UniProtKB/Swiss-Prot annotation:
Quaternary structure, from the entry: Substrate-recognition component of the GID/CTLH complex. In the absence of stress, the complex exists as an inactive anticipatory complex (GID(Ant)), composed of Gid1, the E3 ubiquitin-ligase Gid2, Gid5, Gid8, and the RING-like subunit Gid9, awaiting a substrate receptor to form the active E3 ligase complex. When cells are shifted to glucose-containing medium, the substrate receptor Gid4 is induced and becomes part of the complex, named GID(SR4). Additionally, Gid7 transforms the GID(SR4) E3 ligase core into a higher-order supramolecular assembly (Chelator-GID(SR4)).
Function text: Substrate-recognition component of the GID E3 ligase complex recruiting N termini and catalyzing ubiquitination of proteins targeted for degradation. GID E3 is regulated through assembly with interchangeable N-degron-binding substrate receptors induced by distinct environmental perturbations. Required for the adaptation to osmotic or heat stress. Specific for substrates with an N-terminal Pro (Pro/N-degron).
Organism: Schizosaccharomyces pombe (strain 972 / ATCC 24843)
GO cellular component, one term: vacuole
Compositionally biased spans, kind Basic residues: 99-108
Family in the record: Belongs to the GID4/VID24 family.
Lineage: Eukaryota, Fungi, Dikarya, Ascomycota, Taphrinomycotina
Protein name according to UniProt: GID complex substrate-recognition subunit 10
Name of the encoding gene: gid10
Polar residues composition bias: residue spans: 1-11, 28-41, 169-185
Domain of life: Eukaryota
Record keywords, A-Z: Nucleus
């Protein structure tokens, strides 16, 4: 039934800020501002009745107070009144600022000013740092993180330039001005050059050190009194724990000086070809680079750079640095290619339990120094190798080796049981043997004789074993192993005692199953016994099974 006209007149005559009569009617829509309505219903009806929400919540008395904290409804400042501030204090307190922003504003430096500071030139930065003395005081907190990093870089650059300037002054001849170098202190301070990226750096040879080695050779003016100044070398040898460990070790490969001052290194290997290997490593540029950056004057020609020799301590320390990086190759490569599941060692059909290999092994006839081998038929042995157990998970294998001379005498047969390890280039199984009386020099010489590295020089070999990509490509074609004789099963000759002390450096070709190896004997380090094995074709028999 339609309403009467009086109801419409009463609704039109109501105050515009008051609620209309239609919102309080007895229909199914409750009053959203009543106390009987829950908060969820009130919020729901606020969307349904926007006019009722605005008229009920805002009035003429409190409309200005409600909009005070809203930045969008701030009244514009009066141009005639200079005391008015654009930012209302209540509006400023409503913003949520970070602690860094508060510190910058309290110190009078805004974000834009901090950006201008960070975009300064290098000369301005150096001037600011020297004026404020940031080396002794901490960096101000009002700098942004980007500015703090930039300040740190400039500080490091400033220290490097100061060290380089002092080094240049020490290495050059002093001029006619006596106050050019010795104006600050009567005694020249010792300044160390910037350290290398390697964790342990051996001391530099005397020919490569940057220091005042001979003060009498310097030219001074006549008015300069040299007695008041004490000279000190610019680069003094630092204490190296690795070199001290090598000096105190009892290994015959590390020189130890007795009370008379004579080295026992040359007496242990007198006039042997093993000394030629060490001399070849001395002249290797890859090993020489690890001792530190060469001097600019001495590194001008490659001939003078390669003609310098190393002491045994420096050579051992250099090889330790190279093999320390080599041990991290597998870990670095696995982290980079973890999603691809790439491994250096994958199983192959040729190397499994039950595999049999047959070939020849020559006696101690081939020299490490690369001399032509002696091809005497009486010094060849027929070798049969049987693989009993292969465990790729533990990187271990076991087998038996039967060696028989070419003569018809059956008493010349030797049988040994051996255990081996498969190299996966982790921190434990890599090219560094570190056991069985095998130093790093022997590892370099014997691994280089195998087929993957046969055409490489020492420089290329050391670069390859520390490069994960190159080493991974080689492992796709070869498997590297070490075999160690553990037990003599049948001994009827006198040569078995010498063979049990050594071990084999082996590599297996994945394409055809060919095994190439070299036997190393610590008692006869100047000779290596090559081993060549070929897989026997197994006889395959048909098998049946029911489905």
């Amino acid at each position: 039934m339609p309403r009467s006209l009086d109801n419409f007149q009463n609704e039109d005559s109501s105050h515009p800020n008051e609620q209309g009569a239609w919102a309080d009617s007895g229909s199914g829509f409750p009053n959203p501002n009543s106390n009987d309505v829950s908060n969820s219903q009130r919020n729901h009806h606020r969307h349904m009745f926007p006019l009722a929400r605005i008229r009920s919540e805002l009035s003429e008395q409190d409309s200005s107070i409600s909009f005070t904290h809203d930045p969008l409804h701030i009244p514009l400042p009066n141009p005639s009144n200079n005391n008015d501030n654009i930012f209302h204090p209540q509006v400023h307190s409503s913003f949520h600022s970070r602690s860094a922003s508060r510190q910058r504003r309290r110190s009078g430096l805004s974000r834009s000013n901090a950006t201008r500071y960070s975009r300064r030139s290098l000369s301005d930065w150096l001037e600011t740092i020297r004026e404020n003395n940031y080396d002794e005081a901490s960096i101000p907190s009002f700098f942004s993180p980007h500015t703090e990093r930039l300040v740190g870089r400039v500080l490091r650059l400033n220290r490097y330039l100061q060290n380089s300037e002092l080094l240049d002054r020490n290495s050059s001849t002093f001029g006619s001005n006596p106050n050019s170098v010795f104006s600050a202190q009567p005694t020249e301070p010792s300044v160390e050059p910037p350290t290398s990226s390697f964790p342990i750096q051996p001391p530099l040879p005397p020919s490569r050190s940057i220091s005042i080695s001979n003060p009498q050779s310097l030219s001074f003016p006549s008015s300069f009194d040299q007695s008041n100044y004490n000279f000190q070398a610019a680069s003094t040898p630092q204490f190296n724990p690795l070199i001290e460990h090598l000096r105190r070790s009892n290994s015959p490969l590390n020189p130890s000086h007795d009370s008379a001052g004579a080295s026992t290194f040359n007496t242990y290997f007198p006039n042997s070809t093993y000394q030629n290997i060490l001399n070849s490593l001395d002249n290797n540029p890859a090993v020489l680079d690890l001792n530190g950056p060469p001097n600019q004057e001495s590194s001008s020609s490659a001939s003078s750079y390669g003609s310098r020799t190393q002491t045994p301590n420096a050579r051992s320390c250099s090889l330790n640095i190279v093999f320390h990086k080599h041990k991290k190759v597998c870990t670095y490569y696995m982290i980079r290619h973890y999603a691809k599941r790439r491994l250096f060692i994958t199983p192959t059909w040729w190397l499994r339990s039950g595999s049999v290999f047959r070939g020849l092994q020559f006696g101690g006839v081939q020299s490490i120094s690369g001399l032509p081998p002696l091809t005497n038929p009486k010094e060849r042995w027929i070798v049969d190798v049987s693989i009993h157990v292969v465990d790729y998970k533990r990187r271990a294998l076991e087998g038996q080796l039967n060696a028989q001379a070419r003569s018809s005498d059956p008493s010349s047969t030797i049988s040994t049981a051996w255990t081996g390890e498969i190299l996966d280039f982790s921190e434990k199984l890599n090219f560094a043997t570190e056991k069985w009386s095998a130093p790093l020099e022997i590892d370099v010489c014997y691994w280089r004789k195998l087929a993957p590295f046969q055409n490489m020089d020492t420089n290329t070999f050391l670069e390859t074993i520390t490069n994960p990509k190159k080493l991974y490509k080689i492992c796709q074609k070869y498997i590297f192993m070490r075999w160690k004789d553990m037990l003599i099963l049948k001994d009827q000759t006198d040569t078995s005692e010498s063979r049990i002390t050594g071990f084999y450096f082996c590599c297996l070709c994945r394409e055809n199953g060919y095994i190439q190896g070299y036997y190393y004997d610590p008692k006869h380090a100047f000779c290596s016994q090559p081993l060549n094995l070929f897989p026997e074709q197994p006889s395959l028999s048909p098998s049946y099974h029911f489905v």
